[in-house]
Swiss-Prot record:
Keyword Protein biosynthesis: no
Protein name stated in the entry: Type II methyltransferase M.CviBI
GO BP, one annotated term: mismatch repair
EC category name: transferase
Any one Pfam family match given in the protein's UniProt record, by short name: MethyltransfD12
Organism annotation: Paramecium bursaria Chlorella virus NC1A
Superkingdom field: Viruses
Family indicated by similarity: Belongs to the N(4)/N(6)-methyltransferase family.
Positions that bind S-adenosyl-L-methionine: 7, 11, 54, 177
Disulfide bond residue pairs: none
Gene name of this polypeptide: CVIBIM
Length: 260
């Protein structure tokens, strides 16, 4: 299964680079930084128990709605809301309270916003412009495979601190795909800087959980996880600009880090 929504830094194209390091002797899969949850959807069904967590309220609402059998309601919302600029900004300005409405709004915006970007203003409002894409696919939302895996998953809106404090057993496999070490630390819906990275590394080094992390390489991260870096690989990115032109290729190095 591919991710339900596009997510910056998603690992769909990199799974083959690290999936062989996923342990086969663990019964519980845990992902504290869910995002698009590419790894969860790829290997989650191999585990008896599954825990998916993120601090992004709308993302968690989407996963919970699907798990609770509300996919059809989201699909109906998509069918009844046009892919045009007027409708887009009406939906973007809407502030629903019911979690299924929150999930529907979020899914619509993820499918129709520019380049699937995730950007918020200082007040926490989503401020990505309309994408102007002629076609987009939302049929996947009613794919029963998503319901089947999510209905058997504990879905949490919790920080990584909570996850490590709550789950601490050698039978747990924790996949970590945290925000990268970057000068950009405020994501609108959360902040994640060097202080958080240090805290995460302390959990990583002291927990009983078997942890596998994939993260962009920086001197800070290399120093933080010295002795735990198993391998590394090159990753190339190329973004499509608003003008339609393809941007310059960006080369990065990703580290595969594990504590077992």
């Amino acid at each position: 299964m591919k991710p339900i929504v596009k997510w910056s830094g998603g690992k769909t194209d990199e799974l083959k680079r690290f999936e062989d390091y996923i342990p086969s002797d663990c019964s519980t899969f845990i992902e504290p930084f869910a995002g698009g949850a590419a790894t969860f959807f790829h290997v989650g069904n191999q585990f008896e128990n599954k825990v998916l967590s993120d601090v992004h309220v709308e993302l968690v609402a989407l996963y919970r709605a699907i798990a609770n059998g509300k996919s059809q309601a989201i699909y109906d919302f998509m069918k009844s809301h046009a892919n045009d600029e007027k409708t887009y900004y009406e939906v973007r300005s809407w502030k629903p309270e019911d979690y299924v409405d929150v999930a529907s709004r979020f899914y619509y915006l993820r499918k129709t916003c520019f380049r699937g970007m995730m950007r918020y203003n200082k007040n926490g409002g989503f401020n990505v412009p309309f994408g102007r894409y002629k076609t987009y696919n939302f049929e996947d939302i009613i794919n029963e495979e998503y319901y089947n895996i999510l209905k058997d998953t504990i879905i949490l809106e919790k920080s990584f601190d909570y996850i490590f404090e709550t789950y601490n057993d050698s039978s747990n496999f924790v996949f970590l795909d945290p925000p990268y070490d970057s000068v950009f630390t405020d994501y609108g819906y959360c902040s994640f800087g060097k202080e958080e990275h240090v805290r995460l590394s302390n959990f990583f080094k002291t927990t009983k959980n078997k942890c596998l992390m994939v993260i962009g390489a920086t001197d800070f991260i290399r120093e933080l996880y010295d002795g735990y870096i198993h391998t590394e690989y090159e990753k190339k990115y190329r973004f499509k600009l608003h003008s339609g032109r393809v941007g310059d290729e960006i080369n990065t190095t990703h580290l595969v880090i594990k504590n077992y």
